[in-house]
Every structure is written in C-alpha cells, then in structure tokens.
Curated annotation (Swiss-Prot):
This is Regulatory protein BlaR1. Residues 23-31, 123-311 are cytoplasmic. The keyword Zinc does not apply. PANTHER family: POSSIBLE SENSOR-TRANSDUCER PROTEIN BLAR, SLR0241 PROTEIN. Residues 1-4, 49-104, 329-585 are extracellular. Belongs to the peptidase M56 family. NCBIfam families: blaR1_generic, sensor_BlaR1. The chain crosses the membrane at residues 5-22, 32-48, 105-122, 312-328. Keywords: Cell membrane, Membrane, Transmembrane, Transmembrane helix, Transposable element. The modification N6-carboxylysine is found at residue 392.
Length: 585
C-alpha cells in the first residue's frame, strides 16, 4: 500500500507541475487563462496506480474441463540404473526493507484522515441543508431587481436566488439545485450598481457549476487525503473559480465600471469579516490572500473569447504524458506482474485443489506428444513471481554457452567463506551445485556474464519480465519475475526449439537436473524457495519427465500456505502420479 501511495503522489505531482508550467507560459506569453477543469487530470494521475489493469480472459481452442489421466505404457526405457536424489532445502533468507510495517502505518493514517475529512464533509453538507431551510423567498421588489440585473441572461430553473438573515456575505452552493443566498440587508443597504456586481458574480458560479465541481473535488480529496498536494490543487480551483466569475462580471459591465467593481471587491474583502468557512460553497468576499490576484486579473483581463483548441491540445498532451509516466512509475506494471499472451495450443483445466490443500498456487504441464497444456488455477499461473533458484537452470546454460564452465571442467573452488549449509562449503561442479542449489557457484557464473548478453538471451527466450535491475542477484526476490505458465513455455522452448544453445550443453544441463531415474521414467527438475525477512513466500518446482511414450514439461508454484521448493516438489510428484505420468511407482 505504501508503495502505491508514493507512486500516486509522484504521479500527481508530475502532472501538477506540468499544468503549472502550461499555465505560466500561456498566461505570460498569450494572456490565456486555462480552465480550472484541467485540474481533474491531476486526480486521474493520482488514481492510476490504484486502477487494476484487467484484460479479458483469453479464450483457448478446444478447452476441456474433464480431469485427465495420461496414458502410460510399461515399455522399458532401456535404462538399468535406478537413481533417486533426496529432497533437500537449500534456501537463504533475504533481508529486504520491510514494507509491511510501513504499509500498516500508512493504511491506518489514511483511514483516520478519510474519517476526519468525511466528518468535515458531512458537517459542511448539513450546514448547507440548514442554510437552504432557513433561507427566505424574495419579495416582489427584490425579484424585480434580480430580473433587471439578469435580464440578458437565461435564468435557468436549476438556479435559485434567495435571501438569508444569518449570513454576512453572499454565497453560492449546490444542494440539489444551485442556490445563491444574499444577505437580507444587502437589498436595503447596498447600492444597486454594487448589488448588480454581486448578483452577476454569484450567478457565474452557479452558471459554471463551480459549486458542484467543488463538491466532486472534495470527495476526491477525501479519497486522496494521503496526498498533501491535493489540498493545494483544491485551493487553486477555488481561486480559479473566483477569477472566472470576475471575468464573467467584466464581460457584462461597461469598461468604465471595472474600477468600481474592483473597489466593490476590496470593500467586501477588507470590511466584511470572512464569513464562508464552508468547504462546499463560494463566498463573494473571499479570502484576503486571493484579493491581490483578483485585482490584477481585473486590471489585465483578456475578455476575448478563448480558443478551446488550446485547452483540448493541452488535455490530450497531458493525458498521453500521464499514461507514459504512470507506467514508468509502476515499474512496467502491465508486464511485470502478469503474463498476458494467449496460448495458441489446446489446454485442459485441472482440479487439483485437494492435492494443494491449504497451499495457494498453480500447476502447469505440457505434453510434447499431444501438444497440449494441462493447467490448474489458470489465473494464478499467469501471475509473475521471482524465479529464485529455478533461474539457476538458465545461469547454468548461459555459463555453458559462454564457456565459463564446460562438460569436461565445471569445477569451481570454494573460497573458504563459511556458508549456512555444509554442502556449500566445498569445491563444486555443475551437478553438485545444482543438486545443492549452491548460491555462490551460480553467482560466480553470473558475475562473468556481461549484462548485455543476459539481456539478449532473456529477450530471445522471452523470459518473464526480462528485468535485470541492478544485475546483482536479480533472480532472488528482486527485479526478475516470471509466471508459472511461462516457466513451462520458456523451459520447453529452450530445450526443444532453441538452436542457439548446443545439444551438448543441453545434455549437460539435463544431467545436472536429474532427480529420479528408473525403467518407467526419468524425472528432471529444480526447486526454488523465496524467504524474505524470515518468511517463506515463494516456492517453485520446475522440470520435465521422460517416459516411454511422451515427454512432459511441468512447473508448480506456491504463493501461500507452505510456499517452499520442497513442498512444491512433493505436490508436483503427487499430481504427476495421479495423472499417470509417474506410472509404476
């Protein structure tokens, strides 16, 4: 949550500063006043990080929902060797900045702010209801004055003008209709010319729907109360409303009255105590802080009709920039966290919830013979996670391709640094390093591979989000992410279709991945476990099975429950047995 709030503030700030720049340029060099509605773009920018990017579910051909059993014949694999490597857990705890506590604190603060501001909003709304209820209808003489002032304007039915005894300054608000309230004393004590200015000014607020937009913006400011800039923008909207209402008055009076109108504003602001403390209405006297700007705008007023093309261009340009920068801030959010491409093969839905039990995750298997996928929890299988130690499959292949290691010599000497597992504290070759998931072995390979080479290979393989980050242990709960479905697709394509890597390198890699071998099948695979700040949060088992009649690529991922590589391997074997892939156990 904290990350989303930060991204929202940054996104909001970027568009806010951009609009300020546009306003400055247009005002200084073109005497053009941007409409206050452009500030809605800042709200949209602030909300984008919270909008879940959802695409329609991909439809596959010939989808079958029946639970399958894969046919298995008892032909001999022509192997007389029985091999079983024990399941072991070799995972280290990764210490990262703990966002959980920050998330909890920021969420609590946000909720408190929302409650406080919601109460303030409700209180303001109830006060408007009170003002409406205690307002009085105008008498005939007062109606005639209003009709004379607004003679050249279409008096809309949704605009109501009334008087009130309890207010000191004219105000305009929306409560089902646009209501303009004039202090009762004004019809007696204020000269007709000054009353005309006041009525025109308040009528402009109602005509432009300023008060309705003020309510809408206040609602958004409650939702985005975590962002201090939203309150600055709200003040700017109120200021823009007043300036726009002043322009409306100037357009409806003679030029020789401009000075008198300015004096009326000064007299009202300086001599009448500031009345309007309601956040949902506009008051004629306004705040003293706005007086200088209003007077300058009256003096420099450009009363020519302003082109809407400039406004449209700025809105479109800003919107495009907003989309681009939001994707940058979200770290390629569309591609980082979900695999979106449709499968062009048949696939079959599985129900393996009983085997998964309390574990949350997914299972994907591909049959080479049938050219068909078998998927449990398709939605989850498209979510991307850190590959952790399953990425060592690719580091090994890259190391073989770059001749950092080879089939004749894949040994690396131990640097005598003490590691958490005894199996790591010795000389390693590819087989032992893969079996014991020795971090230092594969980190040493990675350190000798240029970043541009890795980036090229990941692009060719279409490996997950291809994000190498700082290029330091990027596969261990860091920038690189891949989905369970992609694990199967990428691994299968690399071993079966990729011509860049030699057959010799593929055979050596396979040898290091061998787990079980008997007369019925050969099981190859690699586990992966993600532990962050002592918490297990990611478990993988990726591999393939060779039987007498077929070859199957598979991957199991666990995201909750008991998410470890060891548990993922146990679940995988149960599913493969149930489906008949590991027949004859």
């Amino acid at each position: 949550m904290a990350k989303l709030l930060i991204m929202s503030i940054v996104s909001f700030c970027f568009i806010f500063l951009l609009l300020l720049f546009f306003r400055y340029i247009l005002k200084r060099y073109f005497n053009y006043m941007l409409n206050y509605k452009v500030w809605y773009l800042t709200l949209l920018a602030g909300l984008i990080p919270f909008i879940p990017i959802k695409f329609s579910l991909f439809k596959f051909n010939n989808v079958n929902n029946q639970a399958p059993t894969v046919e298995s014949k008892s032909h001999d694999l022509n192997h007389n060797i029985n091999t079983t490597k024990p399941i072991q857990e070799f995972a280290t705890d990764i210490h990262k900045f703990n966002w959980d506590s920050i998330d909890n604190i920021s969420t609590v603060i946000w909720i408190v702010l929302v409650i406080i501001l919601s109460f303030k909003f409700l209180k303001a709304l109830l006060y408007l209801k009170y003002l409406k209820k205690q307002s009085l209808y105008l008498n005939e003489n007062e109606k005639n004055k209003i009709d004379t002032i607004l003679f050249n304007h279409q008096y809309k039915k949704n605009i109501v003008i009334r008087k009130a005894e309890t207010i000191q300054s004219p105000i305009t608000f929306w409560y089902g209709k646009y209501i303009i309230l004039i202090p009762s004393s004004y019809f007696k004590s204020v000269i007709d010319k000054r009353l005309k200015y006041i009525i025109l000014h308040e009528y402009a607020h109602a005509k432009n729907r300023d008060t309705l937009h003020l309510i809408i913006f206040n609602i958004f400011s409650i939702i985005m109360s975590y962002n201090p800039l939203v309150h600055i923008v709200k003040r700017k909207i109120i200021h823009d409303n007043e300036v726009e209402a002043d322009r409306f008055v100037l357009n409806n009076i003679n030029k020789n009255e401009f000075k008198t109108y300015a004096e009326s504003i000064m007299d009202s602001v300086l001599n009448v105590p500031f009345f309007n403390k309601n956040i949902l209405s506009h008051s004629f006297n306004g705040k003293k802080s706005l007086l200088k700007r209003r007077l300058i705008n009256i003096k420099e007023a450009n009363l020519k009709k302003q082109s809407k093309l400039i406004l449209i261009f700025i809105c479109i340009f800003t919107f495009l920039l907003m989309v681009i920068q939001s994707q940058f801030l979200m770290g390629q959010s569309i591609t980082d966290y979900n695999y979106k491409k449709p499968l062009h093969n048949d696939y079959q839905i599985l129900d393996k919830s009983k085997i998964f039990g309390s574990n949350s995750g997914s299972f994907v298997m591909y049959s080479m013979k049938k050219d068909k996928y078998y998927i449990y929890n398709e939605k989850e299988s498209r979510k991307r996670y850190s590959p952790n130690s399953t990425y060592k499959i690719y580091l090994a292949m890259f190391g073989l391709d770059r001749h950092i290691i080879n089939d004749e010599n894949s040994r690396m000497s131990w640097n005598h640094k003490h590691y958490p597992f005894d199996a790591w504290n010795k000389e390693q070759d590819l087989n032992t390093a893969m079996q014991n998931s020795v971090n230092w072995y594969f980190e040493r390979i990675s350190d000798q591979i240029p970043k541009n080479y890795t980036a090229t290979q990941l692009k060719q393989l279409n490996y997950g989000n291809k994000n190498l980050g700082s290029y330091k242990s990027y596969w261990m709960e860091d920038s690189l992410k891949i989905s369970n479905l992609e694990q199967v697709i990428v691994f299968k394509n690399m071993m079966e279709q990729n011509n860049h890597f030699s057959k010799k390198a593929k055979n050596q890699l396979s040898s290091s991945l061998l787990i079980k071998k008997n007369e019925k099948y050969e099981l190859y695979g690699k586990t992966g476990t993600g532990i962050v700040n002592g918490k297990y949060n990611n478990g993988w088992f990726v591999g393939y099975v060779i039987t007498n009649h077929d070859k199957y690529y598979f991957a199991t991922h666990l995201s909750d429950g008991k998410p470890s590589g060891k548990n993922a391997e146990l679940i995988s074997e149960k599913i493969l047995k149930e489906m008949g892939v590991l027949n004859g156990q």
